[in-house]
């Protein structure tokens, strides 16, 4: 007669290490300590006394600026006023830590510029598997697998003027990461009679940047901008 034996092994600790009465007492004690901690926070005002972190000689008792001190915490966000989406910033890359740094930098920049923002939202991660031959001759039958993971995150800006959004995006583009791809979508809101305002415009004033240019390409661009077909599609 064949007998099969089964053996099991688990590294999980015991669920109940305390008796029921000891567990109830522990929960009550934790509730009392939490209430005491909340009362102490509401009554006692904590003193702001940051440390001086610098290798140079500084003025005595000179504190660190508050915006530098806030780098240790999550980015602050302003509340929405109307909830109108004005811009969407999508970032993607292969290193998730860099995406978090870029997202927090954009959130901190928007906070100091007065732009209400959404939290940093994670989008669907893209995973791809590539299979190629190892070499075209002797090892042509040998295959190699390459696994690529692309992370994506998104930020949404609300209730801000177009000029502020352009300034915010230009500052982010100026300090961008080389291994992170940025994609911004800007939304603009116009009145209901916007098409009538466009029809009422008879002439479009070109910028002065095209004046006095001898470049034939620039002259051709100026000619196309003045053409009737361009104004018709505009």
UniProtKB/Swiss-Prot annotation:
Keyword Mitochondrion in annotation: yes
Superkingdom as given in the UniProt entry: Eukaryota
Keyword field: Mitochondrion, Ribonucleoprotein, Ribosomal protein, Transit peptide
Gene Ontology annotations for the cellular component aspect, listed alphabetically: mitochondrial small ribosomal subunit; mitochondrion; small ribosomal subunit
UniProt xrefs under InterPro entries: Ribosomal_uS10, Ribosomal_uS10_dom, Ribosomal_uS10_dom_sf
Record localization: Mitochondrion
GO biological process: translation
Keyword Signal on entry: no
Single GO MF annotation: structural constituent of ribosome
A Pfam family the protein falls into: Ribosomal_S10
Range of the transit peptide: 1-23
Description of how the protein assembles with itself and partners: Component of the mitochondrial small ribosomal subunit (mt-SSU).
Family in the record: Belongs to the universal ribosomal protein uS10 family.
Classification via PANTHER family: 30S RIBOSOMAL PROTEIN S10 FAMILY MEMBER
Function (record text): Component of the mitochondrial ribosome (mitoribosome), a dedicated translation machinery responsible for the synthesis of mitochondrial genome-encoded proteins, including at least some of the essential transmembrane subunits of the mitochondrial respiratory chain. The mitoribosomes are attached to the mitochondrial inner membrane and translation products are cotranslationally integrated into the membrane.
Descriptive protein name: Small ribosomal subunit protein uS10m
Lineage: Eukaryota, Fungi, Dikarya, Ascomycota, Saccharomycotina
């Amino acid at each position: 007669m064949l007998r099969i034996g089964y053996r099991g092994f688990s590294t999980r600790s015991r669920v109940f290490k305390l008796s029921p009465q000891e567990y109830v007492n522990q929960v009550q004690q934790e509730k009392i300590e939490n209430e005491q901690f909340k009362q102490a926070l509401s009554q006692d005002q904590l003193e702001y006394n940051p440390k001086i972190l610098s290798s140079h000689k500084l003025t005595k008792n000179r504190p660190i600026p508050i915006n530098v001190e806030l780098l240790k915490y999550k980015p602050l966000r302003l509340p929405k006023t109307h909830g109108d989406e004005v811009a969407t910033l999508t970032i993607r890359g292969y290193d998730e830590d860099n995406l978090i740094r870029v997202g927090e930098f954009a959130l901190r920049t928007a906070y100091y510029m007065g732009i209400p923002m959404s939290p940093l939202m994670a989008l669907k991660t893209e995973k791809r598997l590539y299979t190629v031959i190892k070499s075209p001759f002797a090892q042509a039958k040998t295959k190699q697998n390459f696994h690529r993971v692309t992370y994506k995150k998104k930020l949404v800006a609300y209730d801000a003027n177009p000029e502020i959004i352009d300034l915010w995006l230009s500052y982010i583009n100026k300090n961008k990461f080389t291994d992170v791809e940025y994609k911004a979508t800007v939304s603009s809101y116009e009145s209901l009679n916007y098409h009538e305002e466009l029809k009422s415009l008879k002439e479009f004033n070109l910028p002065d940047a095209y004046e006095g240019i001898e470049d034939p390409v620039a002259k051709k661009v100026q000619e196309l901008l003045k053409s009737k077909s361009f104004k018709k599609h505009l």
